[in-house]
């Protein structure tokens, strides 16, 4: 495919036009009085959202240079969403302000590389101030306030705070669609995985169709069990102990399964067989997790352990195991706390190293099952469009709350950036183009607050000037139009969100300013429609 090339000012202005179109569509959603954006879908009902990254993803521009500019800003929103789960609109507004101010200075003759260095130093100084000013999140109310602001709904904030309180910061909170109207929270006690009993004959509670075994031994096996002779020596030892047995294996079939079922029906011996969760390497890892949690070992020929020679000390223990037809829950495994902590550290290191979103998600689930627990928020709404929008808001708010617990909170509403900037720029001593670069940041960090004010029907410049001179932590409550102590009023943002938004916006802005040429695909002319005539069927009716 042939290419087109633009140089110098033409290249940068083309990128800026694309960025402005995307940013202008996104920034109307910022703040408590921000509006929604309707996104048309190729199939199904349109989506209504106020989430910056969702809007950005939908924007495809026709002009090749504008398209590249928009794609670069999409990257800001996506990266901020990946890291912090929120702040995508703030990041987009900051990127637009940094680029606008930066290009003005480049056009006036400033050296782009000098500006880039100045921007980087200023952002580092502001980030340092933000982290220094962050308040640790210690109460449920603080989490509820943060999540409530992100979701735009205090009741969602309270539910998320309740969920985090139960499962801990390592726990997993998932959001599911509900058939009923409103919100509900469902908590999982212990480790749960999505495999149920192999045979319904194992059921101990016919009414609830589940098997519940108290204080069982747990056999964890990385292979199939088909013949009873392999299992018999271990079965006899477990029967002598008087405890029930849970078998987690690749599969249990044939006479081995028949023997277990017959003994269960006769009341001789209580047991349940469950297929191991996952596939391939992930199955191995999850069996290892179950072994660590219950204080047992995975019986596998790879490590020289065989079923027919296994002893009771290789089996795991738990206070209770509950098995339904679809899932298994292990409550209070008897694993060593240090071993579990070591395994958690190992999984966390894998998450850091992984560059696949899918792998990261699966590792996060494993981490939650070991370290915390799982909470499910079920959301319902009147229409499918509203339900999707609500579910998305809750997912964002969950990540926002976790970010708050991780690094702490700062005053919300765009105020923290301005007030951190006031302190940072007092200490910053730069000259020449680097000083100009720092000044670009000084002007740009006011953009989120100004946009929040504009969306609330106020004059952005007047509000920014007033906030700059207020005591630290005081600012505009855009919902009421009053100037208050924001942290005291529960208006806060996770510092991770604010910091990520600024750092990612500055990174893309520096790319814009130092661009001297843009090479894009030449737009293809649409092929003319074939004319109808005698040779074809163009003139015929069907």
From Swiss-Prot:
CDD domains: GroEL
Subunit composition and interactions: Forms a cylinder of 14 subunits composed of two heptameric rings stacked back-to-back. Interacts with the co-chaperonin GroES.
Family as reported in the entry's similarity comment: Belongs to the chaperonin (HSP60) family.
EC number: 5.6.1.7
Entry function: Together with its co-chaperonin GroES, plays an essential role in assisting protein folding. The GroEL-GroES system forms a nano-cage that allows encapsulation of the non-native substrate proteins and provides a physical environment optimized to promote and accelerate protein folding.
PANTHER family in the record: 60 KDA HEAT SHOCK PROTEIN, MITOCHONDRIAL
Catalytic reactions of this protein: ATP + H2O + a folded polypeptide = ADP + phosphate + an unfolded polypeptide
Class of this enzyme: isomerase
Keywords linked to the UniProt accession: ATP-binding, Chaperone, Cytoplasm, Isomerase, Nucleotide-binding
Any one GO molecular function term: ATP-dependent protein folding chaperone
Subcellular locations according to the entry: Cytoplasm
GO terms classed as biological process: protein refolding
Protein name: Chaperonin GroEL 2
Chaperone listed as a keyword: yes
GO CC aspect terms: cytoplasm
Pfam families assigned to the protein according to its UniProt record, in alphabetical order: Cpn60_TCP1
Protein residues bound to ATP: 29-32, 86-90, 413, 477-479, 493
Alphabetized PROSITE patterns for the sequence: CHAPERONINS_CPN60
Species of provenance: Kineococcus radiotolerans (strain ATCC BAA-149 / DSM 14245 / SRS30216)
Keyword Chaperone on entry: yes
């Amino acid at each position: 495919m042939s290419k087109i090339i633009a140089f110098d000012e033409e290249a940068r202005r083309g990128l800026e036009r694309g960025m402005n179109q995307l940013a202008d569509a996104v920034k109307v959603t910022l703040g408590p009085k921000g509006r929604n954006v309707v996104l048309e879908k190729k199939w199904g009902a349109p989506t209504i959202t106020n989430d910056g990254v969702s809007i950005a993803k939908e924007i495809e521009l026709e002009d090749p240079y504008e398209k590249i500019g928009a794609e670069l800003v999409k990257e800001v929103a996506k990266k901020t969403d990946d890291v912090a789960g929120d702040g995508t609109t703030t990041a987009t507004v900051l990127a637009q302000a940094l680029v606008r101010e930066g290009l003005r200075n480049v056009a006036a003759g400033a050296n782009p590389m000098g500006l880039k260095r100045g921007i980087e130093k200023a952002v580092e100084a502001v980030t340092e101030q933000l982290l220094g000013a962050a308040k640790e999140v210690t109460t449920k109310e603080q989490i509820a306030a943060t999540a409530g602001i992100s979701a735009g709904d205090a009741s969602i904030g309270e539910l998320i705070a309740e969920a985090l309180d139960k499962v801990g910061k390592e726990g997993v909170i998932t959001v599911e669609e509900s058939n009923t109207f409103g919100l509900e929270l469902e908590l999982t006690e212990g480790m749960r995985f999505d495999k149920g009993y192999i045979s319904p004959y194992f059921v101990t509670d016919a009414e609830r169709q589940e098997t519940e075994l108290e204080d069982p031994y747990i056999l964890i096996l990385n292979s199939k069990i088909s013949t009873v002779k392999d299992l018999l020596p271990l079965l006899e030892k477990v029967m002598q102990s008087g405890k029930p047995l849970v078998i987690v294996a690749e599969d249990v079939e044939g006479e081995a399964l028949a023997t277990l079922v017959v003994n269960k029906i006769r009341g001789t011996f209580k047991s349940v067989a469950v297929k191991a969760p996952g596939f391939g390497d992930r199955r191995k890892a999850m069996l290892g997790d179950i072994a660590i949690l219950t204080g047992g070992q995975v019986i596998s020929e790879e490590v020289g352990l065989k079923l027919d020679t296994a002893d009771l000390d290789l089996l795991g223990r738990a206070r209770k195991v509950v098995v339904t037809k679809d899932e298994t829950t292990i409550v209070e495994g008897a694993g060593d706390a240090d071993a579990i902590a070591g395994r958690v550290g190992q999984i966390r290191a894998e998450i850091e190293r992984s560059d696949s979103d899918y792998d990261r998600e699966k590792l996060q689930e494993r981490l939650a099952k070991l370290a915390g627990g799982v909470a499910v928020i079920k959301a319902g709404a009147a229409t499918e469009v509203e339900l999707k929008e609500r579910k998305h808001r809750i997912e964002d708010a969950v990540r926002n709350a976790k970010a708050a617990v991780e690094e702490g909170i700062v005053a919300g509403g765009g105020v923290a950036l301005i007030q951190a900037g006031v302190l940072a720029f007092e200490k910053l001593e730069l000259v020449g183009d680097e000083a100009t670069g720092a000044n670009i940041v000084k002007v740009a960090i006011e953009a989120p607050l100004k946009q929040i004010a504009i969306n609330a029907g106020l004059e952005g410049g007047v509000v920014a000037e007033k906030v700059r001179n207020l005591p630290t932590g005081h600012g505009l409550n855009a919902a009421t139009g009053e100037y208050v102590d924001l942290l005291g009023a529960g208006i806060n943002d996770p510092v991770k969100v604010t910091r990520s938004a600024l750092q990612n916006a500055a990174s893309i802005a520096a790319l814009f300013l130092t661009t001297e040429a843009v090479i894009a695909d030449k737009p293809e002319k649409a092929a003319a429609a074939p004319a109808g005539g005698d040779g074809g069927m163009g003139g015929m009716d069907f």
